Each structure stands twice: as structure tokens, then as C-alpha cells.
């Protein structure tokens, strides 16, 4: 097995085996398109990249994670450190079967440089071991695992982290997972559906439905009606789904919403409601539109009276 790996401080243009960190001050956009310095969270960016060749098969591994600075001892920073560490442990390699033991970092989980390096190495090793078996049977394929967890948007009341997980383990195409998590600054609590008044679930679904119509529309095929929309989607009858969620079969997304610069963001994962060709159906509902449907927690995050 041929391995390429280099650990230490490296320039961004290095293609194989790099572990590097840089201090980044993220900025938040203002209403006029300008930007002001963020006053909530400063992060370091840690990236692991490695490749391996196993006879006729190949492995690519990339883990890229933002992490609060070591000197930040706020409850928000502590909450995010634990969240980032768990995310790296969960996504260090493609899902290769139920028999795969989860990776658990035995060192200091607040040391993201060492955690990312250990997780990256473990992922390359496990993918290589499986590909060795496949190569021995004459298969030519590759495993790609690309995970990113980045600071997406922040205010003095909340911070949103975005994660993107791109995996390929052979076959016609890979898989892409997008998730985001919003954290309340004052206590580091992770927020999700509790930002909305779910007693108004039918109105929330109605807003999402209108956004999905726009998402699936094209220049020569505008989707206006519910009937047109559901001809594009791929839905299943689920006996466990409450009756009030079954209007034309559209449920709330399995992934909780998050707060971004231009509104509340909703995202369905691949195959959740649509065929692969439609990707990840996603909707951003502007804050002035979603405001009447917010819970007390959601209104607090957006500083709404």
C-alpha cells in the first residue's frame, strides 16, 4: 500500500497530507452589504488531508473544522468545542457498515489539532483496509470522505455552524449531507425546532411548501400548484406520520432549522422527499415572514419583542 502523508504546518496549496491551522476572524454582514467585525466568536481552522493507494483502489480523506480559540472560556465556546469534537468523531470516515466500531479520541478533546489528525488517520486506515479486500477481488474503485464544519453566521445572540459531508464509496454517485446547528450565546444551548411555535405546524409547512415550489421550478417549468409540486417529489405514506402533516404528504424536514444571515433555513436530505436529481431541497424563509411563527426562544435569538 502506498501512502502519502505529511503532518505539521503547511501551505494551503499542498495537495496531500496536510494539517494546518490559522486564526480567522469571521465577520457578519449588515443590512447594507457592508461587514463589521464579529464580537462573539473567533475561531481557528484545522484541516487534515491525506490520500492512500491500495493496488488499483484509492482513498481520499479531508476533515476541515473551525474551533474556538484556546483562551476562550465562555460557556458558548465550551459547548461548541464538544459539538465539534463529536462531529469529527462521527464523520471521520464513510459509513462502511454496522460492524464498524465508532472512532473515539482518547486524548484531550479540546486539542482539535490532535483530534483531527487522529480521526483522519483512523479514517484512512479503515477505508484502506476495506479497499484492500475489494482490490484483492479485482475491483477498481475509490473512497472519498470530505467533511467540513465551519462557522456560518453569528450575531451577539447566536452562532450558527454549517456542516457539509460529501462521501463516495463506489457506485453510480456519492452522497451529500448538509446540516447546520444554531447555538444560543448566553448559555451555549443548541437550538432547533424549539425556535418555532409547533402549534402552528400547518403554517410552517405551508411556507416550506411554497419555497420548495420555487426550488424545483425551472425557467421552462414553473411549479405553482401543490399537484405540480408533488409530481416532482418522491414521498411515502408513513403510518407513523401525524395526520396533520400529511397534506399532500409533505412532512417537516428531519433536520432542524437554523438561522442564517437572510432568514431561517430549512433543508431536506437526499432522498428524504425527492429523487437524487433534485439534490437537497432547501428553503430560506425571510425573518419578517417567519416572525409570527417563532416561539419565545426564537424571538429572543432575533431580538424581537
Segments (PLM) and residue ranges:
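Compositionally biased intrinsically disordered regions enriched in Thr/Gly
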Residues: 24-305
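Bacterial N-terminal signal peptides that target proteins for export
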Residues: 1-10
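C-terminal motif of bacterial Sec signal peptides marking the signal peptidase cleavage site
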Residues: 19-22
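Core hydrophobic alpha-helical transmembrane segments of single-pass membrane proteins
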Residues: 11-16
Amino acid at each position: 500500500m502506498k501512502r502519502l502523508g505529511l503532518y505539521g504546518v503547511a501551505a494551503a496549496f499542498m495537495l496531500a497530507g496536510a494539517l494546518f491551522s490559522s486564526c480567522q476572524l469571521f465577520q457578519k454582514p449588515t443590512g447594507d452589504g457592508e461587514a463589521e467585525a464579529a464580537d462573539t466568536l473567533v475561531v481557528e481552522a484545522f484541516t487534515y488531508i491525506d490520500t492512500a493507494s491500495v493496488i488499483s483502489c484509492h482513498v481520499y480523506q479531508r476533515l476541515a473544522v473551525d474551533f474556538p480559540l484556546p483562551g476562550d472560556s465562555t460557556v458558548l465556546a465550551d459547548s461548541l468545542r464538544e459539538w465539534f469534537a463529536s462531529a469529527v468523531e462521527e464523520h471521520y470516515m464513510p459509513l462502511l457498515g454496522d460492524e464498524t466500531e465508532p472512532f473515539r479520541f482518547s486524548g484531550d478533546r479540546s486539542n482539535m489539532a490532535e483530534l483531527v489528525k487522529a480521526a483522519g488517520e483512523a479514517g484512512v486506515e479503515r477505508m484502506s483496509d476495506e479497499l484492500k479486500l475489494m482490490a484483492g477481488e479485482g475491483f477498481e474503485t475509490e473512497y472519498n470522505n470530505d467533511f467540513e464544519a465551519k462557522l456560518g453566521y453569528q450575531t451577539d445572540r447566536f452562532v450558527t455552524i454549517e456542516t457539509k459531508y460529501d462521501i463516495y464509496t463506489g457506485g453510480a454517485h456519492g452522497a451529500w449531507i448538509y446540516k447546520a446547528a444554531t447555538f444560543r450565546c448566553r448559555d451555549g444551548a443548541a437550538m432547533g425546532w424549539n425556535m418555532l411555535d409547533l402549534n402552528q405546524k400547518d403554517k410552517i409547512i405551508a411556507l416550506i411548501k411554497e419555497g420548495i415550489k420555487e426550488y424545483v421550478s425551472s425557467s421552462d417549468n414553473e411549479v405553482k400548484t401543490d399537484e405540480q409540486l408533488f409530481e416532482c417529489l418522491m414521498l411515502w405514506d408513513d403510518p407513523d406520520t401525524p395526520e396533520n402533516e400529511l397534506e399532500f404528504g409533505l412532512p417537516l424536514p428531519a433536520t432542524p432549522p437554523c438561522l442564517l444571515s437572510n432568514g431561517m433555513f430549512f433543508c431536506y436530505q437526499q432522498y428524504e422527499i425527492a429523487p437524487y436529481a433534485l439534490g437537497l431541497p432547501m428553503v430560506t424563509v425571510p425573518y419578517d415572514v417567519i416572525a409570527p411563527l417563532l416561539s419565545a426562544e426564537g424571538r429572543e435569538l432575533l431580538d424581537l419583542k
